[in-house]
Amino acid sequence: MKRFDQVVVVTLNPTIDRVLEVSDFRAGGHQRCVRRDRYPAGKGINVVRAMASLGQTATLTGFVGEAESEWYQQFLLGEGIEDCRLISVPGFTRENITVVDPNAPGSDTHLMEQGFTVMADELAQLRDSLGPLASAGNLVSFCGSLPPGVSAEQFAELIRLCLDSGAEVAVDTSGDSLRASARLPLWLVKPNRQELAELSGHTSQTDELLLSSASLLAEQIRWVLLSLGGEGAVLVDSRIARRAVLPLRTEEVVSTVGCGDILFGGFLAGWQGAEWKEGDLQEVPDPASEALRRGVAAATFAATQLTPTIALARVQALEPDVEISNTDLPDASRPNE
């Protein structure tokens, strides 16, 4: 294993996030915002922003509403994302509104819009642009939900196009698009606890069952990066499960919006920045574990911020405190019921 020649991030359904800080928020009546932020977001956007903040480059493609296209491009350029190839489509980029109450950690309120619809010719344009980007040695990462006009089967077809072109593919999505993509020979999939339980068909979410389900996925997917929120993350391959955790006190958590995306972006940045050597991944330090360490440190720092932003020096300062342990995998062929 080695770093990729190029990381390409595909965001099909980006957002504009508005974060409102309202002390003692309650539904009904009139309340004053203490702080307001507005910025491009969505899984793919958060991933490339995290990578740029941690010193690694990525190419961004996908769709954006034409009304926000120029603002998106300028904002991302200011974040150090120079290779932005988003395709403008008629309509508006959806907005997500998050209300954060600083006096009630963990009680964020989320309001989510539906955005533009992707037409057949626009999807064909994206398909044509992905071909040259999906060459051998590159990683194409599909991040986020599907917009109206793109089905789960069409999503899987985009993935197959990249695989057939020689690229490795990573996926961070949910629902039907996750189920469609999990059947393919991916390089990585990044579910959270609930998504993995739904994917495996189990209602229980015990650690033992989650690891069993992840190891079953790892029979055909190279890496399963399982996000566990405040309990850290687990990186599962065909041999071992690496668990990483960096606990936060409840009062330190400001907002968890986008932290799973930061975990993934931090992991990719750590992977690209690792000191790869000849031989297998059991060499010390283990590059996969170090990539996981960076991802968890980045996500933990992001949880202490109102918006999902990170600073390299602060993340590096947290990394020594990330605890990583290897876990024996249960028998993937006999998951517990």
Where are these regions (language model features)?
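Positively charged, low-complexity intrinsically disordered leader regions
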Residues: 1-28
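Substrate-binding N-lobe of the ribokinase-like
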Residues: 32-94
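Short beta-strand scaffold segments in enzyme catalytic cores
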Residues: 49, 95-99, 232-236
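Short, conserved phosphate/pyrophosphate- and ester-handling motifs at nucleotide-, phospho-/glycolipid
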Residues: 51, 192, 260
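Conserved phosphate-binding/catalytic loop of the ribokinase/pfkB sugar-kinase fold
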Residues: 88, 98-136
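Conserved beta-alpha-beta core of the PfkB/ribokinase-like small-molecule kinase fold
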Residues: 127, 139-209
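Conserved phosphate-binding/catalytic region of the ribokinase-like
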Residues: 179, 207-337
